[in-house]
Each structure stands twice: as C-alpha cells, then as structure tokens.
C-alpha cells in the first residue's frame, strides 16, 4: 500500500512510523529544518521517504507519488493546507482514501466529501465522545 502523509508534526510522524512498518510511506513537509530532523529520525526505516515541499502544489504531490497512492493523510498544522491537499489528492490524483486532520474545531464542518475528505480526524470531537461515553458508563454503574 502507498501512503502519503502531509505534515511531519507529531501526528504525521506517528502515522508514518506505524504505517511505515509494513507499507510504503512518503512524508511531505514544508519546513527545511523539520525535513532534516524527520529524515534523520526515519533513516533506519526503509519504507519511509521524506520530501520537502508544499502539499498545495500538484507537482509536489505528483513527486510524492499521489498518482499511485492508496491513502493520503493531511496532518499539517493548518486547516487551509489540509483541505487543499485533500481536495487535490481526491480530485486531481483520485486517491482512494483521503483523511484530514482537523486543527481548529470551528473548521470541522468543512472536512467533508466536497473538499475530498473521506475521514475527518477531529481530536477534540474524539475526546468529547470518549468523555461522554465515560460519563454514561459511570452513570450506568451507579444505577446498578
């Protein structure tokens, strides 16, 4: 499986580390410094490649292998970049599964199929659901 991870922050690196154990991963990162540190971090992992560039540029996505990618994960620190990357991955390169990481919960509503997003990762929403489930479970235990 070919996976492109946009953004080499904490989430992007974790995804690349986990998926890179068994699959071909390309990390696309805009920052020169972060590219250097991530390249060093992943030098022993033969399945992970680091490419410096901006995911808003189709030529960079093509160089990353978006035309043959199975999964695209937009995990930059900026919703605008994530959404444009998702849109390009889905519409220009026909990537099968596009995942976008929501940075600002107010922008959650944008992460949908019209922007090319198949799955929206919203950590605030995930935490809220977990808290609600815990509260519900605690209430149920008290009733018993």
Predicted ranges, named:
Residues 1-144:
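Cytosolic regulatory regions of ion transport systems
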């Amino acid at each position: 499986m070919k996976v492109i991870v946009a953004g080499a922050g904490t989430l992007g690196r974790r995804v690349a580390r986990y998926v890179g154990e068994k699959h071909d991963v390309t990390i696309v990162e805009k920052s020169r410094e972060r590219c250097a540190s991530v390249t060093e971090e992943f030098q022993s992992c033969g399945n992970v490649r680091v490419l410096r560039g901006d995911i808003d540029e189709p030529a960079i996505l093509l160089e990353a292998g978006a035309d043959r990618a199975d999964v695209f994960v937009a995990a930059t620190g900026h919703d605008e970049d994530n959404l444009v990357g998702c849109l390009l991955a889905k519409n220009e390169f026909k990537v099968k599964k596009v995942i976008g990481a929501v940075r600002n919960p107010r922008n959650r509503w944008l992460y949908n199929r019209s922007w090319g997003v198949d799955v929206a990762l919203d950590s605030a929403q995930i935490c809220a659901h977990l808290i609600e489930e815990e509260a519900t479970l605690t209430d149920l235990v008290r009733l018993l």
